[in-house]
Amino acid sequence: MKVFKYLVASLLMLAPTVSTHAEGWKNPTSFNGQSGSGMADPFVFKYRGTYYMYVTGDASRVYCWQSRDLVNWTGPVTCCSDPVAKFAYAPEVKYFNGKFYMVTSPAGNGHYILTSDSPTGPFVCATKNLGNSIDGNVLIDDDGKWYFYHAGSNGIMACPMSDPLTIGSEKNVVPAMGGQWTEGPEVFKRNDKYYMFYCGNHYLSRGYRTNIAVSKTGPMSGFMNQDEQNPILISTDGVDNLYGLGHGSVVVGPDLDTYFFCYHNLVSSGSGSYRQFCMDRIGWNGDKLMMYGPTTWRQDAPVVAENDYFDRTELGAQWVTTAGQWGIENRDYLAQTDATAQSYAVMKSSVASNFTAEYTVRLTGTGGSYGAVYAYSDSRNYSTAMINPSAQTIELARTTNGVTTLMGCYAINGVFDAKCWHSIRLEKRDTSLKVFVDNMLCGTVTDAAATSGYVGYATLGTTAQFGYIAHSPYVDGSALTATYLPVPSRLAASHAVDTDASFTEIPLSYGVAHALMLNAGNHATYNINARAKTVYNMGLRYRSSADAKVRVLVNNAVVIDEVTLPATKSVWNVLTLKDISLAGGHSVMRIEVIEGSIDLYEIDARTGSTITDVMTDNFDTTISKDWKHKQGTWTVEDGWLKSPSFGKILMGSTSALGMTDYVVECDMKFGSDVNAGILFRVTNPSMGGAGNDAQLGTDFLQGYFFGLTSSSVVLGKQNYNWKQLVSKNASFYSNKVYHVKVEVVGNTIKCYVDNMNKPLITYTDAQPFISGRVGLRTHSCVARFDNFVLTPLTGTTSGIKGVSLSSTPVSNAHCGIYTLSGQKVAQDMNNVETLPKGVYIVATKDGSRKIMK
């Protein structure tokens, strides 16, 4: 087992070398000059230190906004008014050798590629209609090869590109989501893995959502849907009216390290298509992508690395030059105009031993070499990453006490025009240094001598120009540990801001993730940013060989003390810590192990619930107002709730989303077909397609279902697809009443039919949904329901009056009275007044059930 110490403290000591903007951002965001469809399909990319954003265009133009920090944007400017680009769907831009290439599908009628000499245009059409449906996305791989991805009838398609204007034959690389329309691919590469965001099923549906797939084999094959995480971005419950999340782009933030996903949300459904801009952080637990969103409350602004844009006239005292002729030109870039010298310009800003740095370079002379300086102490001790334009290589060298040693020489793949602007990116962690040119990994060297120092630029026997330069003490995702992580969300345990634990590697199908090895006396501390002042539930995903005890502190106050985490026989399990009170905004949460030891993998932080009242509905005349989400046709007939075919209905408002442990039960009877049951721990329900199709949306939810068919009982998990957990043979018939009950406590589910003393199914889910609403679901059958009762298992009773008979008389003969947990407390009703306050089930001789309150 590979173990290494977590070194956060050293990074935090370096934090003053970067600056932040205090205002932050809050989703969704409005922009000046939004078009008729708002900020649909936002694409953001970075060029020479500036971010450029493009969205779906209107009838005559495509707009572009600009920012240096992803929060403060200027514009828009019209970047394209070419007649071919009317209603330009999802425009995306790539920079390559001095040209900007925009790919778009005007009105969804096939793709065109337009070109420009500037990211702000004007873009003009350079191709005929290239077809390939909609939502084109381009990846340039490390070997310089280009790939084109787009939506198709069978899912996401991939095509090789022989040049920036030519698209080859397509291949299906990701199947359609749920067999329905799938779109919006966004592919990027990190640490030799290919990550793809994609979305569906209909952009006008509130259930429009984002999935992720990962490939370790290549850009045209091997993409594996991450079912454990999908949908990775979804919101349909109505919290802050955020719906329809998808079609975004990935960009590295101004700290040079943190990834961000920029996407849109749907404001209106039906005929409307107005969308707004949203942005959330991506975290990395090893190779595992963690989506810290969606958020609707204020997030801290991205950290901005120490930088220089040379947008002035004088170089200034913050720079030191040696030899050559250095000066700022056009308030835009630094130029070195003496081709005879070996010269350097370094920025007097201390750089950490672990760092990320970005440079922008362009050759103006001939021959020689030019590039980046790092770890500069003085003129006799420094490291360089120099481009040799004649050989089309980048050479990494270390000079110590005046003696230069070549550490590595790597080819710059693909077509390379040195007279155009190019970027160099360095990532140094411990003694390992990665070098990228134009975001393509060229190679990795060992540079043990480079510890700290300055960054800058250098020329050798040539002239060159140099643009935006920046450096950050963060590398390989380390910046996120100091971030106030949003709650609710799923937190990686490894994203602790402070811990004295070690890491252990967790194998994934495509790489590795990390868990914390917490022994007695160890702790893990997290900066968290809570949506609101309320209670939260924390599902700890852990494993242990023996029982362990933990406590939880928030802002140094104990909120959970000495809770036992049962032994898991070293397999992963989840234990939910309930009702942790958090103030809205920033807090510090600390988990301490008191006894034993655990490996802590993730923390599923969800909004809790303060509901303790029993919720009931007898459907005497109408449907209770407690039912807040209805799909399909639901009516009350003769005191029964009826669904004629497909549908689902959920009890409780958004305040019920945090309910964890409870008993839910009801009576059921069927028409000619049998296929219906109880939903529980449900979140994010939606209907299918633009027309809110109840049949298509039958499985569009996250939660559990316990149901009856004519020949079985079945327990399943629905995560916008269906996964059967347990099925047992049993016979159920039309026009007979059955009493069905589910009891869910922690990650254990017990399911009953008629016999309330013996569950037909007992199941423990190692990775459960920890909270959610309850409801009913029917699938292609006429089903009726009565005497619906939801009882929170909180250890207290609230809002329950004294015992009384139901309004419908019930025969005293041959009946039994039961508690909701199935315990028989009386044979008949002669002594009903002596029963404690509560809710009871009366079983009559004809098999019907009535509720007593």
Q: Where are the regions that the model predicts?
A:
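Aromatic sugar-binding interfaces of carbohydrate-active proteins
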Residues: 209-284, 437-464, 752-780
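Extracellular glycan-recognition regions
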Residues: 286-537, 542, 546-577, 583-586, ...
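Bacterial Sec-dependent N-terminal signal peptides
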Residues: 1-23
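Generic structural signal for well-ordered beta-strand positions
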Residues: 126, 147, 292, 405, ...
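Intrinsically disordered, low-complexity repeat and linker tracts
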Residues: 20-21, 301, 608-612, 796-812
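C-terminal outer-membrane/trafficking sorting elements
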Residues: 797-853
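Short acidic/polar inter-strand loop motif in beta-rich domains
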Residues: 595-599, 847
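Beta-rich carbohydrate-recognition and catalytic domains
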Residues: 22-182, 189-194, 198-239, 254-307, ...
